[in-house]
């Protein structure tokens, strides 16, 4: 395992540095590192690392979501209003509709199988989008109109909506029926996640304040460890109560961080955000190298040109969905184009659930996985490069 960790960090950082030298986003190098070192090419990563890959990826995602929550200005988010809510489900819904309408014609699957494929593909990647929106907030690009805050909030909720739909469509493809309860669970999951996170965040704030008043000074480094541990517990709670009620653990993590920012002094929240930013340097490498390692590149050839056509058509539907979310806002056409670009990347969810239909024995399983792999390899570079190279031209600096 130690050798694997050494390879992940050293080769991942080296490839990231090379990509940055040629003006490409570093995550492209990390993703390529994972693909090459992973089990489907050189097979240099130990099974023990790959066995806990999903948990490590989730931990890395927790770190960037905590930084996001500690950087998020809620007053700016309030300015945005309803588009932030619409961005959490409208673009994904449009993309799924694109698959349902065109996948049977282009790829020869049934409508239900097309719905399963659309649900796999519908989520934007918070791992790609969130750190970039945090960077924009720190640099002051688009913050006057709350653009990065809106995209960050939408990307955090988007996954919940898509995963619930995926579970429902998968049941239908296996001969089951859609359950109204599954759809009701979407808002319940979001609301309970926010409430749980806010409660835990407030209790943590009170704990730190009480310790300070009793002359037990808790260092910010210690606070970081406590917050990280509590975040892991929130995700564990999501699993513990899943049989009874749905709670979004990741949304609870963001809400907890937001509550800590609101209640704490500016100095403390800024210091904590900086510390999570430093932790993200290592977490980002782990996340994207392991996402790359989960990608079976052999399925790229199986997907073929028709899969590429389908991905492109569905992304056009997604772009229309993003534009609809912007209706009634004061955003310029440049800012709307940026929102479309920011909502392109696929990675985290697709790497996590892309192989589930195949494991479930669906006849479309191989095709779904092939399309998911192709989408990751294509949209991560395009989305990351698109955001990094256009935000200074498309957004206003505050």
Identify the meaning behind each predicted range.
Residues 1-398:
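Transmembrane helical cores of multi-pass secondary ion antiporters/exchangers
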């Amino acid at each position: 395992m130690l050798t694997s960790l050494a390879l992940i960090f050293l080769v991942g950082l080296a490839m990231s540095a090379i990509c940055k030298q040629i003006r490409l986003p570093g995550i492209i190098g990390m993703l390529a590192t994972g693909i090459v070192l992973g089990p489907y090419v050189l097979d240099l990563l130990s099974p023990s690392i790959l066995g806990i890959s999903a948990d490590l990826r989730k931990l890395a995602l927790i770190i960037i979501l905590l930084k996001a929550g500690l950087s998020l200005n809620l007053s700016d988010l309030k300015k945005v209003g309803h588009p932030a809510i619409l961005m959490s489900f409208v673009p994904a819904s449009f993309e799924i509709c694109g698959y349902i309408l065109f996948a049977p014609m282009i790829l020869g699957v049934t409508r239900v199988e097309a719905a399963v494929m659309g649900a796999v593909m519908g989520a934007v990647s918070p791992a790609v989008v969130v750190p970039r929106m945090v960077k924009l907030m720190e640099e002051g690009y688009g913050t006057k109109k709350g653009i990065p805050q809106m995209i960050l909030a939408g990307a955090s909720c988007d996954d919940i909506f898509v995963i619930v739909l995926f579970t429902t469509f998968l049941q239908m493809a296996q001969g089951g029926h859609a359950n109204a309860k599954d759809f009701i669970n979407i808002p319940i999951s979001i609301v309970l996640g926010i409430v749980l996170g806010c409660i835990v965040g407030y209790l943590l704030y009170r704990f730190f304040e009480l310790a300070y008043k009793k002359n037990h000074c808790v260092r910010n480094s210690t606070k970081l460890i406590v917050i990280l541990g509590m975040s892991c517990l929130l995700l564990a709670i999501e699993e513990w109560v899943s049989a009874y009620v749905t709670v979004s653990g990741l949304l609870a993590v963001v809400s907890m961080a937001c509550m800590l920012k609101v209640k704490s002094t500016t100095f403390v929240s800024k210091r904590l955000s900086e510390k999570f930013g430093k932790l993200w340097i290592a977490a980002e490498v782990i996340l994207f190298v392991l996402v790359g390692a989960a990608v079976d590149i052999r399925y790229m050839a199986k997907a073929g040109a028709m899969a590429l056509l389908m991905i492109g058509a569905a992304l056009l539907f997604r772009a229309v969905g993003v534009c609809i979310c912007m209706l009634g806002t004061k955003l310029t056409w440049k800012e709307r184009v940026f929102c479309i670009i920011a909502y392109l990347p696929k990675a985290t969810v697709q790497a996590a659930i892309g192989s589930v239909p195949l494991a479930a024995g669906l006849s479309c399983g191989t095709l779904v996985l092939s399309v998911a792999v192709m989408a990751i390899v294509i949209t991560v570079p395009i989305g990351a490069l698109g955001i990094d190279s256009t935000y200074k031209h498309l957004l206003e600096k505050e």
